[in-house]
A protein has these predicted regions:
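FAD-binding core/adjacent interface of flavoenzyme oxidoreductases
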Residues: 40-134
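A Rossmann-like FAD-binding core segment of flavoenzymes
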Residues: 39-76, 152-199
Length: 199
């Protein structure tokens, strides 16, 4: 078994989710995202699973199946150069990608300072960068609510969270802990229809 990871560290998106709320069902303990990921990383490191970190899969080719099994060749670029792994099965565990602005149908110019919630979260929690001094958050799912609180804690003035639906999409506890406790307004039913800006 081998794990190919494009980042330098295992853990995926959990590394930037520094808020608690993970691990309750699996470990019967409330953990942050990095703590939760580390539990699994520690388990992996006790095995003979080969780890290819800071590596990018370039292609997956399937050969002709034999009577017993199919053969797959995974070509990857690693810090040591190009490698090929051969196996009977390939599991794509790539997480998810956030929808871009064009995918959620928001027209307008493309100025700097418009981020997906995940990118803003990475900037703050991993890169130690502040995305801006003022923010408006579109969407009241849990990540939007958590980022409203996180931005506020980092000194960004969050003008409000705007939700297209007439109700918040995140957990009620997150509305209370992330918005109500910090005085961040939640605007239900309006949404962004256009982005206007320069640079």
């Amino acid at each position: 078994v081998a794990i190919v990871e494009r980042e330098r560290h295992l853990g995926g998106i959990l590394r930037q989710c520094i808020h608690p709320g993970f691990g309750l069902s699996h470990f019967k303990q409330e953990l942050t995202g990095p703590e939760y990921a580390q539990r699994f990383i520690d388990q992996v490191r006790t095995t003979d699973i080969a780890l290819f970190l800071d590596s990018m899969v370039l292609g997956i080719d399937s050969g002709k199946p034999t009577e017993d099994t199919a053969v797959h060749t995974v070509t990857l670029m690693s810090p040591t150069g190009m490698l090929q792994l051969i196996g009977r099965a390939v599991v794509l565990a790539m997480g998810c990608r956030e929808r871009t602005r064009s995918e959620i149908k928001i027209p307008g110019s493309r100025p700097a300072g418009v981020f997906t919630a995940g990118l803003a979260q990475r900037y703050i929690n991993i890169e130690n960068l502040k995305p801006g001094s003022r923010a408006v958050i579109l969407g009241s799912g849990d990540i939007g609510l958590i980022m409203a609180r996180r931005c506020t804690l980092e000194g960004t003035s969050v003008e409000g969270v705007y939700e297209l639906m007439p109700y918040a999409n995140g957990l009620r506890r997150n509305v209370k802990n992330c918005l109500d406790d910090f005085g961040i307004p939640l605007h239900l039913s309006p949404t962004v229809t256009r982005v206007i800006g320069h640079d």
